[in-house]
């Protein structure tokens, strides 16, 4: 069924192809193998939490194919970091890699922890004092933390996080203050 679906996807006239789910490394995660067997799989696995099972390749005709994780928060993160910029570039945007979100500088309400060696996409909400409150970072399928989030903070791969009171750049999901 996935082979038929992938063939149908390749038959479209879309400029880029985006697939969600079945992108990790388990026996049921067939998309990376299918793509490498029919087109090319140029990148699989990112040092980003929670989007690590993301992949990037090409259809047989050279069009970009993005493999996004099936977990909702992982998929959102992969979209923000790869799909959005790719679509903006294909659309002719002059600076496609900049995030389209309004960015605000906020004080952290509590400790934000991260692991050196990977970039973390941390959902945050803004409290009544305007401080950034890190939300649950475990569980890529933890959609509830994203639903209540006002935005996200990207923690660089060389950082262990930030202490309460430190200032962070919050990428807002919408135009609320």
Predicted feature locations:
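N-terminal small/polar loop signature for handling phosphorylated ligands or for N-terminal nucleophile
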Residues: 1-37
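Flexible glycine/proline-rich
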Residues: 34-177
């Amino acid at each position: 069924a996935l082979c038929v679906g992938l063939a149908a996807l390749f038959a479209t006239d879309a400029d880029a192809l985006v697939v969600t789910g079945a992108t990790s490394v388990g026996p049921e995660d067939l998309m990376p193998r299918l793509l490498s067997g029919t087109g090319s799989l140029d990148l699989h696995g990112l040092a980003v939490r929670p989007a690590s099972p993301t992949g990037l390749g090409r259809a047989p005709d050279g069009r970009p194919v993005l493999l996004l994780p099936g977990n909702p928060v992982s998929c959102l993160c992969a979209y923000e970091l790869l799909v959005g910029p790719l679509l903006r570039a294909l659309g002719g945007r002059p600076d496609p890699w900049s995030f389209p979100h309004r960015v605000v500088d906020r004080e952290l309400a509590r400790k934000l922890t991260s692991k050196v060696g990977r970039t973390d996409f941390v959902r945050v909400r803004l409290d009544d004092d305007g401080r950034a409150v890190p939300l649950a970072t475990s569980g890529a399928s933890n959609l509830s933390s994203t639903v209540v989030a006002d935005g996200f903070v990207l923690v660089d791969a060389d950082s262990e996080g930030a202490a309460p009171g430190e200032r962070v750049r919050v990428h807002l999901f919408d135009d609320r203050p």
